[in-house]
Structure formats: structure tokens, C-alpha cells
Amino acid sequence: MESGAVLLESKSSPFNLLHEMHELRLLGHLCDVTVSVEYQGVRKDFMAHKAVLAATSKFFKEVFLNEKSVDGTRTNVYLNEVQVADFASFLEFVYTAKVQVEEDRVQRMLEVAEKLKCLDLSETCFQLKKQMLESVLLELQNFSESQEVEVSSGSQVSAAPAPRASVATDGPHPSGLTDSLDYPGERASNGMSSDLPPKKSKDKLDKKKEVVKPPYPKIRRASGRLAGRKVFVEIPKKKYTRRLREQQKTAEGDVGDYRCPQDQSPDRVGTEMEQVSKNEGCQAGAELEELSKKAGPEEEEEEEEEDEEGEKKKSNFKCSICEKAFLYEKSFLKHSKHRHGVATEVVYRCDTCGQTFANRCNLKSHQRHVHSSERHFPCELCGKKFKRKKDVKRHVLQVHEGGGERHRCGQCGKGLSSKTALRLHERTHTGDRPYGCTECGARFSQPSALKTHMRIHTGEKPFVCDECGARFTQNHMLIYHKRCHTGERPFMCETCGKSFASKEYLKHHNRIHTGSKPFKCEVCFRTFAQRNSLYQHIKVHTGERPYCCDQCGKQFTQLNALQRHRRIHTGERPFMCNACGRTFTDKSTLRRHTSIHDKNTPWKSFLVIVDGSPKNDDGHKTEQPDEEYVSSKLSDKLLSFAENGHFHNLAAVQDTVPTMQENSSADTACKADDSVVSQDTLLATTISELSELTPQTDSMPTQLHSLSNME
């Protein structure tokens, strides 16, 4: 005998299943997907289960089914258009079938449900919004009904209940909202006794004109607008009560023109009452008047202040034909076009750059973001500030999240973060430079480069150093300059370990090790490692010598050469050898001189800067040797030369005396025994050197005198 099949069904199993899955998610157990939600710089990661998300959201189902799964790896999903709090509520609803949110977030949750294609959450939000809207409409009904009851009780009109068919002229009513409502005003108008005297009927009709119409038409229109899911219904604010009250008085004045003749039938009176009831201004005014009665004295004072401010604002837009004032420009333009047939053409132009826009909103946005340097939106990860929120979003996506989708260059394959960056990069291949300077004709591929270039002509230097007040045209130049004060050298050469203040200096230095000389002279085909060296070399071919000495008129191609030359006239010798005490006008001469003492020791170990003890190249102050020791040492050497008559053993004299002053050395002179120099020239050179050393010793006059006697 076969046994019948039975159904085993648990009503608590679905609830228990959701509860257990929720507990597993909170503990992070068995989670196989991480959802990263980022909105306006705020980011948070949520761990969840693929099966739960795919079962409740078609969006996640499509993502998980289309991905290429790899065993043992967790899937990462990025959402950029959902707020963190909203997605957290979405997850709670998915795992518990319920979530508690604020009333103003219901619309946002509905949008999240539509984006993620979660039908259960979408239906729940829609039903809740429907209930909220019905409650608002019910409150409006109660206001109207209570007012009509008060008015009808004061009119003292005997009326019988009217059948429902008498109000069928207004059309069908929304189901569930007004079917069960019965308005006293309607019964009074349609159920009026026919045996009343004509005069009494007219008096009662005048009283009935003050009664507002039943809110059937307004509720019908409201319900039609509420058919969409993204419609908000709000009770009118109390600050507009006075303005609409004036509209009500105007509407009542129009209604007062309707007078019922004495011989008019009651049916005719009822028809006219229906026409009176169609005046929407009366109903709106009555409802708002009821609301205004509940407002306190403080709110009335605020109303008056706001109305006064509104009257002041109205003067901004005034029609020149009918002298009517408007609060908004859009209303003024619409009035001029439809009432007077004047199509006013308004041009929204930026006063700074002259660019035109379609509307005032776009113009204000342009002025706020383009011509303003204020940056109110910081990145929470690195602190960098931006002018707009969407700039923060793009920055986080490109910099902190790996750049997202990369736009590849078709020629070199370089990946760019955006289409704009790709378009600017492609100009490096095409050579396109659409932005030209109106002053000198120089052209640039980017508008920012042109803006920076124009500062050369205008003299603008907006970036100022806080330490010394130096000004620069670009921000990165100021950053490099500040490292002179701090001593920071963050860029180190991996080959020799030398550090530099900027990446550009390190780039030039690396060419020493690589031997790269990318800059080539088109005249003699000589190559250089730095562009500036090429510019200086070109002056050899052109004959240009822009730097001129103001004392002797000699010209130079480089500024540092002129500075070294000026020391000949001033007698300045700031660089001294600490081994022999000899001074020099430039470091290069000292470097060659130090090879006499020790070729294996670095030449900087001999360097002593005697003029004001500035910092040397290593950033440390160098101690000066004792002045008396240096003076006595030099004096002894010079006297020994004078007494022994070894002037003929000095180094060969060059073409000019100043050159000999820099290069002559007593130690090297002893090796040049074969050099034959005239006695007069050598004596003049020695006297010149001694005259320059006079400030360093008090015994120089005696030495000069002895030398003169020897001559």
C-alpha cells in the first residue's frame, strides 16, 4: 500500500536563514565579495556574500555572472554613485528584510533600489511613500472639512442630505481618498428647498459665496501628479500666507459679480454655486488662512520681515511697459514674452574673460570655479584641496584608487587618467599648439602653459617666499627655492649618492654618468648635456655678449664670467687655500692650485671662504684660519722671494696682468726654471699682488719699500 506524500514546511526557516546570514556577515565569516562605496571623497568597504547580493539585486547578479572567477580570490566591486550610509541601509535590508531610515531618506533609498535593481526594496519604499502622501492629503481634507463645517453652521440654512449623484459633474474621485466624504457645503447648494422666497434665496446665496468649494478638483489633480514615484507633496509654507490671501481677495471680488436674479430657479442657483466652487484661489486661501491662524506672533513677525525683503528684491526686475515688478528674472522674461510679445535677449557674459553662457547659473558656476582661487573641498586621504566636489571625486579615483580606466595613447601606448589628459598628450606627437601669445607669438599646447608664459610680459609673480620675500612665476619654483632655506635635498643620485633640491637637477646630473648629451649645436654639431649650456654656446657663433663690465667695458657671454671679472677691479679674493693661505678670485683656480699640495685629497678640503664666512657647498660654515698666521706666512714667502732674488723663477706671465694675478703661484713658479721673463714685468706683477694683500697684514709697506730698493 502506497503512502501519500506530505508537505513539510517551516514558516520560521526563511527568517532564521536571513538571521544566520546576517550574523555571518557581521562577523566577516564566509564573505566572498568586498563592495567599495565611494561618494564625494567618502569611502568605505563592505564585506558580503555573493549569493545573498545576487539573489536580491539584479545588478550584482549580472556583475557576478559576467566576471571571470578565480579560485581563492575575493571579488571587489566599486560603487561611485551611492552614498555610504544608503548602501549600509541597503545591506541591512537585504540581510534582515527591514531597515529604519529617516523620512527624508526614503526617496534616496528608492533611488538606490532602482540603481541596484532591488525589487523588494523598491516596492517597499514606494508603498511607504504612498502612505506618507495619503496622510498629507488626509490632513488637507480635514482642514477643508473643518472650515466648511464652521461656515455652514453659521449660515443657518436648512438642508437635506443630497444624493451622491449630485456631485458627479466633477468627475470620478480618487479611490480610497474621497469616496466616503460628504461635504455640508455641497448639501446646502444642491439640496436647497424650492419653496423659499426669492429674496431669501438671494440672501442665502450671498452668504454661500463665502464658502469655499469642496476640494474634489484639487485632490484629483494632486492624485494625478502623485502617480509618479519621484514627486514630493508639501504643505505650503506659512510665509506665503499673506501673498495668497491677497489672491483670495481678488478671486472673491470676481465671484461677487455673479448675482442671482429674483426669478431664478434653485437649480440655476446650484449650477452657479458649482462655478463659484471652481475658483482654486478661494480654496488655497482658505486652507492657508486656517494654517496662518495656528502660527504664533513670532512667525507673523518673520513673515512681515520676509515680505519686506521680498518687496525690495522685486525692484530688481521691473517691466518697463506695465511697471509690474518681479522677484525672479525668469518670471520677468516670461511675462515680457507672453504678455507684451517682447522677446528680450539676455546675454550672460563673464566680465573677466568675456565668455558667454546659456543661463545665469552656468555663469555663476564659471565665475566661482574658474576665476576664483578658493578651494573649499579637501581630499580626506592626502589633504589636497579642490574647487569642486567632482574634482575631489576624480582625484580620489585617479590618484588613490589606481587610476581606474586608463586611456591609452595610440602612438606610444602611454596610459592617461582621462580623455582630456590623453588629448593634451597627443599634442606632443602631433606638434599641435593652438594657444598663442599675443605679445611675442609663442605658442603652447595647453592653456595653463600660456597663462604661465604671459607672466613674463606682465611681470606678475604671485608666489612669494615667506623667508626672504623672493617672488616667482610658478609654484614649483617657489618650492625649489624654499629648499635653499631648509637645506632639503630629497632627490639622490643612485650612482654616486649626491643629493639635489629638484628632480630637474638630478636629471641633468645623471647625464654625467650616462654620458648623454641630447642638445646639439646646429652650426658646429657640438653636443651638450644641458639645454642652458647649448644656449651659452650658441652665443659663440652669434657673437652675442650681453654682459658688459661697467668699469672697463669688457663683454662676456655668461653672467658668472662677468662676476669673476669684476673681482679684478674690486680686488676681492674670497676663496683661500688653507694649506698655504693663498687667495683666489674663483673656485676653479683654487681647485687647480690644490693639486700642488695633494692630488689625492678632495680640493674642497682646502677651501676656505674668507669673505663674511658664508656657507660652503656642503651647507656647513668653514672656520677661517688665524689671520695673523696667514699674514705672517704670506709675508715670509714674499720676503724670501725678495731677498733671494728669485723673481725669474715665477710662472710665465700670460697676456694680461690680471690673468697672472689669478694663476701665478710661488710653489708652481719654482718648477718653471726655464721660463725667461723680464725683470720689470715680474716686479710689477709682484707689487700688484702685494698691494692687494695690504689689508691682511700691517708689514706690507715695509716689504714694498724693500722691493723698491732692490729695483
Swiss-Prot record:
GO terms for biological process: branching involved in ureteric bud morphogenesis; negative regulation of DNA-templated transcription; negative regulation of transcription by RNA polymerase II; regulation of DNA-templated transcription. Expressed in adult brain, heart, skeletal muscle, kidney and liver. Also detected in fetal brain and kidney, and at lower levels in fetal lung and liver. A zinc finger (C2H2-type) spans 317-340, 348-371, 377-400, 407-429, 435-457, 463-485, 491-513, 519-541, 547-569, 575-597. GO terms for cellular component: cytoplasm; nucleolus; nucleoplasm. Residues 298-309 have a biased composition (Acidic residues). Gene3D superfamilies: Classic Zinc Finger, Potassium Channel Kv1.1, Chain A. Residues 31-103 form the BTB domain. Residues 153-220, 243-312 are annotated as: Disordered. It comes from the Eukaryota. Its main location: cytoplasm. Induction: By GDNF. Interacts with NCL. This is GDNF-inducible zinc finger protein 1.
